[in-house]
A protein has these predicted regions:
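Detector for outer-membrane/organellar transmembrane beta-barrel domains
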Residues: 38, 48-89
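Bacterial Sec-dependent N-terminal signal peptides
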Residues: 1-27
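Transmembrane beta-strand segments that form the barrel wall of outer-membrane beta-barrel proteins
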Residues: 25-35, 55-67, 92-107, 123-131
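Repeated loop/turn-to-beta-strand initiation elements of outer-membrane beta-barrel proteins
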Residues: 52-57, 86-90, 119-125, 154-158
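Short glycine/proline- and aromatic-enriched beta-strand/turn motifs that initiate or cap beta-hairpins
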Residues: 19-52
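Residues on the lipid-exposed face of transmembrane beta-strands in outer-membrane beta-barrel proteins
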Residues: 31-33, 43-47, 78-84, 102, ...
Length: 164
């Protein structure tokens, strides 16, 4: 129930942000690796909200999949990030962003920080705090959190429209 309250809060927050004028939204899909007291593969979808290239907001939903205590497990994850780069008028300086965010699952909440290269490749780390006594296959999901993600903007797959 607490997990649902967090999802509703973040949804209202980002809907309110989207209601502001001139905000661009870019959908993405992503895949990656996460270490959280076990090894997980991750796949999901992500939306980027931006007014300019200096501050980007991302919200995503994904599934963590891996073996925990010898049993296959799938763990839903909701995530919110802010990407920052305040370099002005220098395109190559926008090749990296500092990233801060939080991910939440039914078992843990994990604040994190890291770097994003071109907004495509993310490296993050943080610390996960267990929510209540929730465990995954009898294993506590708290402690060091490491993440590597590759983002694929869906605009890559859209057909270009040419004026005739």
């Amino acid at each position: 129930m607490q997990f649902l309250k967090h999802i509703i809060f973040f949804s209202i927050f980002f809907i309110g942000f989207r209601a502001q004028s001139q905000v661009t939204v870019h959908p993405m899909v992503f895949a990656g690796y996460e270490y959280q007291n076990s090894n997980f593969g991750e796949v999901g979808a992500r939306f980027i909200f931006l007014k300019n290239d200096n501050v980007l907001y991302r919200v995503s939903g994904s599934a963590l999949m891996g073996k925990v205590n010898g049993e296959f497990a799938v763990l839903p994850k909701f995530q919110g990030d802010i990407l920052l780069n305040f370099e002005k008028n220098v395109d190559i300086q926008h090749s990296y962003y500092f990233l801060a965010g939080t991910e939440i699952t039914p078992q843990f909440v994990a604040p994190k920080a890291g770097i994003s290269l071109f907004g495509i490749i993310d490296f993050t780390s943080g610390y996960a705090f267990q929510l209540g006594n929730n465990q995954l296959n009898d294993r506590a999901m708290e402690g060091l959190n490491l993440n590597f993600t590759v983002n694929i903007p869906l605009v890559v797959f859209s057909k270009s429209k040419k004026n005739k």
